[in-house]
């Protein structure tokens, strides 16, 4: 699964916090509509819902 796949199934109200694997500082935070193009095709290692509209994503 890639960030693009998450974008297809997300809604406009969801906020994504994206981390590189092993990093403690996020590389992106916001709606996937504004995700940088260099991240959109990256493979997702895992993701989890922090609450109804906030999703934490870890990239490979």
Regions found by a protein language model. Give the residues of each.
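N-terminal acidic leader/helix
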Residues: 1-24
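Detector for the mature cores of small, proteolytically processed
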Residues: 20-60
